[in-house]
Curated annotation (Swiss-Prot):
InterPro entries: Aldolase_TIM (IPR013785), TAL/FSA (IPR001585), Transaldolase_3B (IPR022999), Transaldolase_3B/F6P_aldolase (IPR004731), Transaldolase_AS (IPR018225), TSA/FSA_arc/bac (IPR033919). HAMAP family: Transaldolase_3b. Its main location: cytoplasm. Its EC number is 2.2.1.2. The lineage of its organism: Bacteria, Bacillati, Bacillota, Bacilli, Bacillales. This is Probable transaldolase 1. It comes from Listeria monocytogenes serotype 4b (strain F2365). Belongs to the transaldolase family. Type 3B subfamily.
Length: 214
């Protein structure tokens, strides 16, 4: 399973990229707005840092407008992926963009049927949301497993991006469930990096080394 970072914060992206474990970036209008910067400026800076898929999301709701927006996003950089909401209009846009050779990421997926429809429309990626399903008492990991099973049975090339990842356990369970990618906030990566036994082990090694020098 590969890792994307879910943020529009350039400093977080730089830190994660320096550690060598991220293969791409996902953004959305909320994350970009949080940075208080121009969308194109942010995305162009991100593409200069990470050599991998960068998802930029449309803000229109009508297919024709999403297609026009998607074409603009795709022209920013060859690594751009157009992120489109899971609606009928969204799938119509996915079909056209796919036919034009533009990669798409269908977001806000909450059921296996939605994922299957998006895949058949030509989506490069589908993004089921774990945390938001957990919030309403559903099991997002069951959804990941169902989508992975269906895609495997029918040889569907669309990749699964586990989104709305809230904690390290989500990450492990996504990997076990068959997700191709987990897009993870920087704060969750920080939690994944740490373990109290690692810290105490380092402290002991250093203490032993200092004692040996005396």
């Amino acid at each position: 399973m590969r890792f994307f970072i879910d943020t529009a914060n350039v400093e977080e992206i730089k830190k994660a990229n320096r550690m060598g474990f991220i293969a791409g970036v996902t953004t959305n209008p909320s994350l970009v707005a949080k940075e208080g910067r121009d969308f194109n400026e942010v995305i162009q800076e991100i593409t200069s840092i990470v050599d991998g898929p960068i998802s930029g999301e449309v803000v229109s709701l009508e297919a024709d407008e999403m297609i026009a927006e998607g074409r603009v996003i795709a022209k920013i950089h060859p690594n751009m992926v157009v992120k489109i909401p899971m609606t009928g209009e969204g799938l119509a846009a996915v079909k056209v963009l796919t036919e034009e050779g533009i990669k798409t990421n269908v977001t806000l997926v909450f059921s296996a049927t939605q994922a299957l429809l998006a895949a058949r429309a030509g989506a490069t990626y589908v993004s089921p949301f774990l945390g938001r399903l957990d919030d309403i008492g559903d099991d997002g990991l069951v959804l990941i497993r169902d989508i992975a099973d269906i895609f495997e049975i029918y040889g569907i090339p669309t990749e699964i991006i586990s989104a709305s990842v809230r904690h390290p356990i989500h990450v492990i369970e996504c990997a076990k469930a068959g997700a191709d990618i987990a897009t993870v906030p920087f704060k969750v990566f920080e939690q994944m990096l740490k373990h109290p036994l690692t810290d105490s082990g380092i402290d002991k090694f250093l203490a032993d080394w200092e004692a040996a020098k005396k």
